[in-house]
């Protein structure tokens, strides 16, 4: 399975044709702002004691509970690193139409990638009730 690597502009265009934007940043990052229409399933969580990032052991289960393997998914994070890892995990798990968003939400200027915000694309501060991690995780518990 080949993972596509796309710009934020391409990700926005793909959203317009039915792709789901999966934001794999932490819950606090997502709550500070995210691409409009995004779903939040963190690849990593902030450990409350150490303040360090640690893997989310439920990542794949939550994605599977909410998106079929034939879903068109564009995966974004802050700069593109976590989303590349998440895209790899999903492709290995059988997801067939996965794209990593280069530059993510905040941009990666050191690699020449503009972020969602810098590109002037639509941003939201709050998620629809069914797109935040708590709601998505709840669906995984129903399985």
Question: Which residues fall in each region the model found?
Answer:
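Short, surface-exposed ligand- or partner-binding patches at beta-edge/loop junctions that are enriched
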Residues: 75-76
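Rhodanese-like catalytic fold shared by cysteine-dependent sulfurtransferases
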Residues: 1-20, 27-72, 81-143
């Amino acid at each position: 399975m080949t993972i596509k690597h796309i710009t934020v502009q391409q990700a926005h265009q793909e959203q317009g044709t039915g792709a789901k934007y999966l934001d794999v940043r932490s819950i606090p990052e997502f709550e500070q702002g995210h691409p409009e229409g995004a779903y939040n399933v963190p690849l990593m969580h902030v450990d409350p004691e150490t303040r360090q990032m640690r893997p989310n052991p439920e990542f794949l289960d939550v994605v599977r509970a909410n998106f079929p393997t034939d879903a068109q998914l564009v995966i974004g994070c802050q700069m593109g690193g976590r989303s590349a890892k998440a895209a790899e995990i999903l492709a290995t798990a059988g997801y067939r139409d996965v794209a990593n968003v280069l530059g993510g939400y905040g941009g990666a200027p050191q690699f020449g990638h503009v972020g969602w915000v810098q590109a002037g694309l639509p941003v939201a501060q709050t998620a629809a009730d069914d797109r935040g991690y708590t709601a998505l995780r709840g669906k995984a518990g129903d399985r």
